UniProtKB/Swiss-Prot annotation:
It comes from Ostreococcus tauri. It is found in: Plastid, Chloroplast thylakoid membrane. It is a single-pass membrane protein. The keyword Transferase does not apply. The lineage of its organism: Eukaryota, Viridiplantae, Chlorophyta, Mamiellophyceae, Mamiellales. The gene is atpF. One of its GO terms (cellular component) is chloroplast thylakoid membrane. This is ATP synthase subunit b, chloroplastic. Keywords: ATP synthesis, CF(0), Chloroplast, Hydrogen ion transport, Ion transport, Membrane, Plastid, Thylakoid, Transmembrane, Transmembrane helix, Transport. It holds the Pfam family ATP-synt_B.
Amino acid sequence: MVSLAEGFGFNTNILETNVLNLAVVLPIVFTLGRDTLTSMLDTRREKILGSLRSADDRFKQAQLELDTAKAELATANDKVKDIKSEGRKTLEALTAEQSSRMAEVATRFAGLKDETIRLEEEKAIAQFRKQLVNVAFEKAIVGIQSQMNASLHRKYIDAKISLMTSRL
C-alpha cells in the first residue's frame, strides 16, 4: 500500500488494490475516456468519410474523363476511316484519270507516228520524183544535144525570135 507520506499514487499490484478503489476509478476513466474516445472516433470517421467522398468524386470525374476520351477516340477513329476511304477514292480517281491520260497520249503518239510516217513517205516520193525529173531532163537534154545539128539549131532560134516579135 501507499503511505500517506509518499503522496497520491496508483497501486499497480492488483492483489493489493481494493475493489472499491477500482469501482470509483474505472467509471471515471470510462466516462471521461468515452467522450474523448468517441470524439476521436467521430473525427476519424469524418476524415475517412471525407476521404471516401473525395475518392468517389475523383473516381466519377475520372470516369467522365474516360467516357469523354472514349467518345473522342471513337470520333477520331471514324475520321480516320473517312480519311482512308476518301484517300482510296481519290487514289482510284487519280489512277483512272492517269490511265485515261496515258491512253490519250498513246493514241496521240500513234496518230503522230502515222502522220510522221505518211509525211516521210510523201517526202521520199517527192524527192524520188524530183530525182526522176532531173534524170529525165538530163537524158532529154543529152538526147536533144545529140540530135541537134546546126540547121535544126538555127530553125529553133528563128522560131523563138519570131515568137518574141509577135508578142511585141
